[in-house]
Swiss-Prot record:
Originating organism: Mus musculus
Protein name: Zinc finger protein 76
Organism taxonomic ancestry: Eukaryota, Metazoa, Chordata, Craniata, Vertebrata
Chief place where the protein resides: nucleus
Region Disordered, annotated ranges: 365-402
Molecular-function GO term, any one: zinc ion binding
Amino acid sequence: MESLGLQTVRLSDGTTAYVQQAVKGEKLLEGQVIQLEDGTTAYIHQVTIQKESFSFEDGQPVQLEDGSMAYIHHTPKEGCDPSALEAVQLEDGSTAYIHHPVPVPSDSAILAVQTEAGLEDLAAEDEEGFGTDTVVALEQYASKVLHDSPASHNGKGQQVGDRAFRCGYKGCGRLYTTAHHLKVHERAHTGDRPYRCDFPSCGKAFATGYGLKSHVRTHTGEKPYKCPEELCSKAFKTSGDLQKHVRTHTGERPFRCPFEGCGRSFTTSNIRKVHVRTHTGERPYTCPEPHCGRGFTSATNYKNHVRIHTGEKPYVCTVPGCGKRFTEYSSLYKHHVVHTHCKPYTCSSCGKTYRQTSTLAMHKRSAHGELEATEESEQALYEQQQLEAASAAEESPPPKPTHIAYLSEVKEESSAIPTQVAMVTEEDGPPQVALITQDGTQQVSLSPEDLQALGSAISVVTQHGSTTLTIPGHHEELATSGTHTVTMVSADGTQTQPVTIITSGALVTEDSSVASLHHQQVALLATANGTHIAVQLEDQQTLEEAISVATAAMQQGAVTLETTESGC
């Protein structure tokens, strides 16, 4: 601790103020009477306060301006190459020593002593939390990698990278090299966020000083980390964000899915974490809006969805004369394309260039069949779907009269309410098929447009959801009318019971109750356990086209047609 002398002024109302001497060397005496600018009288008293020295752990990692990592020490580290040491002066005037893992030019400078250097991913993950299934999957994968990787040692025989500090919270067990980093991590469990933003009307709190420092840049607009790519002009608030962005140019995907047989890899650990939830089924974020209740795998998608209900548009285009507002950052990011002609993203297959990673990813999917996930592309796709849904809801005309023709009745032993499969037709609209309870309170419906996207998949609609089956490659032999039997394959790759397929032809007679429905062609798919799938054929001529609009599950037995009072 060092002493810092200040002059205090006791005002006439009894309060105390501190003054800084204007003239170097001038001394104010104890008890001296002075007159302030407003004409009031004050008395001088000298006090001593303690100022804490700048503290850090010996060997703490720091980040240089060029993005490389080094280590800070109170004294020169023994046995170090002198060319790898650099003396620096800290903010409190004291001297520390920087040890570079490799020699660097003498003009390198320390950007900042970051107590939480390298923890920006942790800070981002803190906002979303960890589900038990997700943590277990990633921990098992990390343990396997650590077990399979050969340990490296330095010249003294001490194991490099040995992690001695383990998190004691149940279901976690993460390891850290220092007690400080463990303490920072534990805030993810305790919810402790000691670093608070002091900007007016903000007040957000963070678990790390680095997180607060990065957040403050959202207020100041500072983006000190610029992309080194020649044709890219992007800049970022943190070195971690820059590192993630650079991977969109290099194609590096260091974060691999731990589930066996998946093999997908991602540019960030956060995208991987969200992807893992597609395996575990975890959806920790639920919309609180009444009658909505949708669940989401990521906090970002959840927040973006909630804004559809609230109408909030916090992201504003800063280009002069524009001022458009958006519900999501990805939408603003996508909008910036209209203000620039730069195309820094190149397709590795054909060489075409694009302004955004999202359009590049869509090009790869459509033109080359490559399935590639980036944070920007997935968010842009999600945003597009949400905006289209919201727009459709706003612009949709009043509901048209609906006619319902019940095709059959399905009653399960566990259900007291019988369920009927119905053909639902809106006035002047295409027919839909729905699963509707007699009291009309539950309905699952699919339109032909929706079902076209299924391709060769059959969606069997039941009270408990949808089960998807795929055709194992008999399209050519099944393209003709008649009766055929094939073995279906479920989504997990297991074979199910044989399915009898009755395509349009003599088996659907004119006096059939099904064929009489608007005199349109209808095909039936009957499984061995008695489940029927009704396929309404409009202009479709092949089985593949018919199956793409497969619509509902029906109980074994004859299909009966009940008409409504409207005569449909």
